Swiss-Prot record:
List of residues that carry Phosphotyrosine: 7
Name the record gives this protein: C-type lectin domain family 12 member A
Gene: Clec12a
Its membrane topology: Single-pass type II membrane protein
Result of altering residue 7 to F: Abolished phosphorylation
Positions on the Extracellular side per record topology: 65-267
Organism in which the protein naturally occurs: Mus musculus
Length: 267
């Protein structure tokens, strides 16, 4: 009898345990299902974020590439514009240089023509207004020669020419030598270096290398100075008196003075 009671109790307890076990299984399964669903959502969110990040990086990369390409195009355009500008400036400078040379050549040609015309006018009229020399002077080659109507010592002659912004006659080139021989000058002081001894020698091109007189003027009263007599050079006391002839460089012939001096029928 007691065994039946014990069996009955065990049987009663088993259904309770079974029910508890079933409840426990249901709760555990529910929790496990919820956790799995939450993990799936998290994974999906992460995947979505990664996808968005990848898309964002792609968009940024595209923007960067487009911007870089645009800037490169602008840079190339600026470089081409700079090169074109430099080339245009170079061509303009070259054109201006060529024009300047042409103008310079034309000016030189006009100057040469004006000088030739003026020489022709001067040969007919010694005091023609185109003459590039002071009034009363003689124009020969590129120099003007003025014979002063006075006598003077060598030092006085130097000072007299200096007062006219000219210099005492000096044989410094072939043109001066030709002028002296052409004029057959007599007893005119020359701008030669004073000497301590009296001498003479023929007029020649060797005189081109003579030293300038201004370099030695101390005790000039005790020295000898040179003068020209036709084709010879003589030395006498610097305190003696001789004729004076001054020399200065001729100015440029003015084209207007030549044109105004031409006859009406030749213009």
């Amino acid at each position: 009898m007691s065994e039946e009671i014990v069996y009955a109790n065990l049987k009663i307890q088993d259904p309770d345990k079974k029910e508890e076990t079933q409840k426990s299984d249901k709760c555990g399964g529910k929790v496990s299902a919820d956790a799995s669903h939450s993990q799936q959502k998290t994974v999906l969110i992460l995947i979505l974020l990664c996808l968005l990040l990848f898309i964002g990086m792609g968009v940024l990369g595209g923007i960067f590439y487009t911007t870089l390409a645009t800037e490169m195009i602008k840079s190339n355009q600026l470089q081409r514009a700079k090169e074109e500008l430099q080339e245009n400036v170079f061509l303009q400078l070259k054109h201006n240089l060529n024009s300047s040379k042409k103008i310079k050549n034309l000016s030189a040609m006009l100057q040469s023509t004006a000088t030739q015309l003026c020489r022709e006018l001067y040969s007919k009229e010694p005091e023609h207004k185109c003459k590039p020399c002071p009034k009363g002077s003689e124009w020969y080659k590129d120099s003007c020669y003025s014979q002063l109507n006075q006598y003077g010592t060598w030092q006085e002659s130097v000072m007299a020419c200096s007062a006219r912004n000219a210099s005492l006659l000096k044989v410094k080139n072939k043109d001066v030598l030709e002028f002296i021989k052409y004029k057959k000058l007599r007893y005119f002081w020359l701008a030669l270096l004073p000497r301590k001894d009296r001498t003479q020698y023929p007029l020649s091109e060797k005189m081109f290398l003579s030293e300038e007189s201004e370099r030695s003027t101390d005790d000039i009263d005790k020295k000898y100075c040179g003068y020209i007599d036709r084709v010879n050079v003589y030395y006498t006391y610097c305190t003696d008196e001789n004729n004076i002839i001054c020399e200065e460089t001729a100015s440029k012939v003015q084209l207007e003075s030549v044109l105004n001096g031409l006859p009406e029928d030749s213009r």
